[in-house]
């Protein structure tokens, strides 16, 4: 249950608009729902910044469990799926803002693990806000979902290959989900359908999606490069941080094009069979590193710019670029 509530001061004036979440606790309720609520109760108080709802209060399970948090006005990104494909400029803008928000969460030692349009909202100034942390994993907290359940946890269309293989600590899983979302907004189609079984989920380990440009000819080659890089099966072949993804979306001229940008059809039967064969019973070769360790491994690029003879306009543009880099 979710209710709109208000915090009122001693003068009777309402302050920050709030929502209260209360779990349904009845016989026959899905245990994952209850555990997920407990996970969110643990995680939300540890998060800060404009990309998450502000935490206000909570109640424990010994009396009445609840969470009170800031209410983000407006709608989620979910209704835009019904309008896909969107204009390319809008796809880029959405992707850049959401990638910036995802990177902010990763810097706070959190992997969301359920990035999808219904869990993304926007403030009035356009800042993306991520909500619903019931499936998330925080490096400094016990992973209750990993301890309690033996099935992959997530939303079928957006789950990364490693999530299907029970890996829950890799921030690059969120980049895969972002790639699914960008693909859908660009083409109007889901890259891997909407599977509802483990067998269906495992197909993404060996079957690659139809290249976006074959479904939408006006999709730029660089954007296809970005999307297909996010959707790589192996995390090592994706973007290593959401900040890198955001920067590429903000500055397409710097995107290095590979064979991904040129693809116009899916891989052939022989290549797909090889992938299927190697995926049989395969477990990911995965290091159990923390989110901060993964971010530290990512390359940092520094550029020196001669501004001795720069115009005022150029200096302002450089300042704006640096500001955006720092924010991401």
Regions found by a protein language model. Name each.
Residues 62-76:
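Conserved short submotifs of the Hanks-type protein kinase catalytic core
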Residues 100-110:
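Protein kinase catalytic-loop region centered on the HRD/HxD motif
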Residues 238:
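Conserved HRD-motif arginine in the catalytic loop of eukaryotic-like protein kinases
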Residues 58:
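Activation-segment/catalytic-loop signature of the eukaryotic protein kinase fold
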């Amino acid at each position: 249950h979710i209710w709109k509530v208000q915090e009122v001061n001693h003068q009777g004036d309402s302050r920050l608009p709030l929502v209260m979440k209360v779990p349904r606790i009845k016989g026959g309720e899905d245990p994952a729902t209850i555990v997920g609520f407990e996970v969110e109760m643990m995680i939300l108080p540890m998060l800060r910044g404009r990309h998450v709802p502000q935490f206000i209060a909570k109640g424990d399970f010994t009396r009445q469990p609840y969470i009170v948090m800031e209410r983000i006005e407006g709608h989620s990104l979910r209704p835009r799926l019904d309008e896909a494909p969107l204009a390319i400029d809008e796809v880029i803008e959405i992707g850049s803002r959401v990638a910036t928000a995802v990177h902010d969460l990763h810097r706070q030692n959190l992997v969301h693990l359920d990035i999808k349009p219904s869990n993304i909202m926007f403030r009035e100034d356009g800042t993306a806000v991520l909500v619903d942390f019931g499936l998330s994993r925080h490096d400094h907290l016990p992973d209750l979902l990993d301890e309690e359940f033996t099935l992959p946890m997530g939303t079928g269309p957006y789950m990364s290959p490693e999530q299907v293989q029970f890996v829950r600590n890799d921030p690059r899983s969120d980049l895969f989900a972002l790639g699914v979302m960008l693909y859908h907004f660009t083409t109007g189609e889901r890259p891997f359908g909407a599977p509802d079984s483990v067998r269906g989920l495992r197909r993404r380990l060996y079957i690659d999606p139809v290249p976006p440009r074959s479904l939408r000819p006006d999709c730029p080659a660089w954007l296809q490069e970005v999307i297909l890089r996010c959707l790589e099966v192996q995390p090592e072949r994706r973007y290593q941080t959401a900040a890198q993804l955001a920067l590429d979306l903000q500055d397409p001229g710097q995107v290095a094009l590979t064979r991904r940008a040129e693809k116009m059809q899916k891989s052939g039967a022989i290549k797909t069979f090889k992938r299927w064969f190697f995926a049989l019973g395969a477990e990911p070769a995965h290091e159990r590193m923390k989110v901060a360790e993964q971010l530290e491994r990512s390359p940092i690029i520094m550029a020196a710019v001669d501004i001795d003879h720069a115009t005022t306009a150029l200096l302002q543009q450089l300042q704006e670029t640096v500001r955006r880099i720092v924010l991401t």
